[in-house]
Amino acid sequence: LGTNPLTFGMPTDEPFPFMLDCATSIIQNGKIEYYARIGHDTPAGLVIARDGSTLTDSVQILKDIRSQKAALAPLGGLGELFAGYKGYGYATVVEILSAALQSGIYLKDLEGKDENGKIRPYHIGHFFIAIDTEAFMGSEAFKKTAGNILRELRNSQKAPGQDRIYTAGEKEYDVWMFRKDKGVPVTEAVQKEFIGLRDELGLTQFKFPFEK
């Protein structure tokens, strides 16, 4: 199974919608790639090896996943004790709905290679549901109720040491508001990747803004 994300978007009466976009695995490749770029280990328990051990070396994890020597743990964690069966079940639901409704490929066929190891095009299925809120209580009533729920959640009792409660999509909205004016930060590791790619393509006459 892949990360098989579940994504929900709902309008509210606030400046931003409720937006939940999450993998059915406990972590996704992009996060591990980020850890590798900044030289950090991946927290234990998020990636499992074939022998059942957990892996933490971010660079090695990426290699092992590509060679099918490692897998991402399901949402909830490893084993029944931490309810990993829930993430496994959610991932299976996405797999079925994305394949069975439109003859999409699934499981091992998603490797992008045929039985002889030859690269072939992906035929990935997707599954969408759109709900016309106007057909129920009306779009404005929906937005108001959704907004009230989010505000009540944010105003609920906070955990010790926490000064704020977020709802899904709120952090991303805050980041977008900041970066649309201030720009997107580029880590030193990514800068090196950009420079290496430019040099490899023979475009050394061009300079990046972060180069001195």
For each feature predicted by the language model, list its residue ranges.
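Phosphate/diphosphate-binding glycine-rich loops and adjacent basic-rich segments that engage nucleotide
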Residues: 1-65
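Generic structural "secondary-structure junction" signal
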Residues: 2-3, 10, 22, 34, ...
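Structural beta-strand/beta-sheet cores of well-ordered domains, especially the beta-sheet scaffolds
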Residues: 4-6, 16-18, 43-44, 71-73, ...
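Glycine-rich beta-alpha junction loops
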Residues: 24-27, 79, 133-135
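Catalytic-core signal marking the mid-to-C-terminal active-site face
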Residues: 96, 101, 105-212
